[in-house]
């Protein structure tokens, strides 16, 4: 069934004012289609290169996902090739998680989401104005099994949820949950953790980046847990889905070695309360039309002080979420079982994730507003099991921020800022253009024909109003600041998490490269949410960026302004096979002197695109 394009994603009639530090070249005339053919490599399907620009676009895209097998033994000094580290730059470390290895020595290529975790650390000494770079693989159980340290060779044995092994065991391979610790990184109470969507985090020694071992976040300090309210639990009794869950648990945990709970790689920090917020869901939730979520809150010493459990009668796939002062917020990315895909997955002919497909049966998107504390904080005793419905069909990818304000008349207003895409575009198997048969990535999956780009990830603002009795008076979605270019990785000054923010930053595509108009991203965007202004900083030709990260100059207690700081972002200069750490003055984005410094990583340590990062002050 062909679904309509969500009307809120259509380009605004009047574009917001945009300030660039340079004027991009005009867009090429509309093309009938964007077709990036895969060259004849002898590894899979073939195609015809129409011109050099198409060929270079294909090569550039592959270059972002080239394995880096080298690790640093000692921190490597990196020097600026442009500008210098500013005198007021705080001392600390920018950690970046992501995959490092995609291809083994036996013919298999894995999906980027299944690539072994490769932690990168840029330490900046603000006093000496010097920087060092360190990079090491997270020594997970999967890495120990698949890597031979004597011969320094790799053989993939774990399938992973998103991959098919071309040179390994396919049929009957139950090694699905391949914890590669490659998604995000957390530092809390002196502990550095690498996270993955589906298993326990791995603890890392923050100086050397040596792996300490697995770390059970949920049970840490459990003896001090004080669950202040049990009204969130469904005590209605055992039903058919509970019975199904009981039957699935020994299969998933015994045969497929899945942990009982799937730890989400996205966490939140409540700066006002100085709490770490995490969420897990049950392993069997992937196969049942019911979802169980456990939210945990930890104090500054990593002691578990509160848990809240919610059972929701919907089949959902959650990657990111949001919180406000008194609520947790979940976008219901709805999925369903795919019988045909399940058979293909069990036979090893498609990734295990093909057992699921998106469920676009509803034209609206449910949003669950879950109480963080006791009922006195709920809106008129509102039943949290009833979601708020937003009229557009959104698949939420990443949450930037959410906050709530209480009006004099008793209304509660909630705003959510996030990146979201259409159900018509999102595809578990084809993310990043993964093709296990050709051992190449197809850029056209991420770069749609003109007109279809509205289906790609964009930044949106969801605004809702609940009255004093908990009824939803309104729920609207619109492009953030009217911005309609493909964008993702929304971030803010973390001191403003969970409360009203004025600024947001993200990675985006300028659309100036005709062969790769939508992805990879080549811009950092700054949104002024009060004035509705948009300012951008763009890379040079054949250079791309990942997730930006805000680095504050001072703490909130010292009178910090929200944008008083810097943006650090990795620039992937594929044309010269180099990576750079770029430091931008957050206040000057959109001006010609936004770049404060560009630090060069040695060529032999050039690394593939990372996922999510963290700034940790010394």
UniProtKB/Swiss-Prot annotation:
Binds 1 Fe(2+) ion per subunit. The keyword Oxidoreductase applies. GO terms for biological process: carotene catabolic process; secondary shoot formation; strigolactone biosynthetic process. InterPro entries: Carotenoid_Oase. Its main location: plastid. It comes from the Eukaryota. Residues 1-31 form a transit peptide. Residues 11-34 are annotated as: Disordered. Fe cation binds at residues 266, 319, 398, 612. The keyword Iron applies. Disruption phenotype: Increased shoot branching. Belongs to the carotenoid oxygenase family. This is Carotenoid cleavage dioxygenase 7, chloroplastic. It comes from Arabidopsis thaliana.
